[in-house]
């Protein structure tokens, strides 16, 4: 049992697991911000543009069940905004990575064979 706890601790304290945990927490907070933006700013503006339509109240009944498709539309808008924000983040991140790779590729690689030939020639001269 003690060995399993040690293995779990080692697993949990690895950088990738901690990074993932932080990302999940930040993602949840970001989701709340986006939901608030959609619910309180974007959808009311869309409603005004569509003649005062309030999406939160859009629903219909099927028997005793209420189908709230307005809330579903808001969830779709949430998803689109979050997906777009992630897309932009990944696009910016990959552009930084590409720039870094380009600078690494642009640095000239020293011609090791030339250096070795020069060293060989210098050693030959010293032996004479």
Swiss-Prot record:
A GO term from the CC aspect: membrane
Recorded GO molecular functions are: mechanosensitive monoatomic ion channel activity
Q: Which domain of life is it from?
A: Bacteria
- Chain ranges passing through the membrane: 11-31, 70-90
User: Where is the protein situated, by its record's location annotation?
Assistant: Cell membrane
Q: What processes does the entry annotate via GO biological process terms?
A: monoatomic ion transport
Look up keyword Disulfide bond and say if it applies.
no
Tell me the keywords, alphabetical order: Cell membrane, Ion channel, Ion transport, Membrane, Transmembrane, Transmembrane helix, Transport
UniProt keyword Transmembrane helix present: yes
Identify the PROSITE patterns for this entry: MSCL (PS01327)
Identify the InterPro entries for this entry. Mechanosensitive_channel_CS, MS_channel, MSC/AndL, MscL_channel
Give the membrane topology.
Multi-pass membrane protein
Major subcellular location class: membrane
Q: Which NCBIfam families match?
A: mscL, PRK00567.1-4, PRK13953.1
Q: What does this protein do?
A: Channel that opens in response to stretch forces in the membrane lipid bilayer. May participate in the regulation of osmotic pressure changes within the cell.
Q: Which PANTHER family match?
A: LARGE-CONDUCTANCE MECHANOSENSITIVE CHANNEL, MECHANOSENSITIVE CHANNEL MSCL
Q: According to its UniProt record, which protein family does this protein belong to?
A: Belongs to the MscL family.
User: Subunit info?
Assistant: Homopentamer.
**What name appears for this protein in its UniProt entry?**
Large-conductance mechanosensitive channel
Q: What does the record give as the organism's lineage?
A: Bacteria, Bacillati, Bacillota, Bacilli, Bacillales
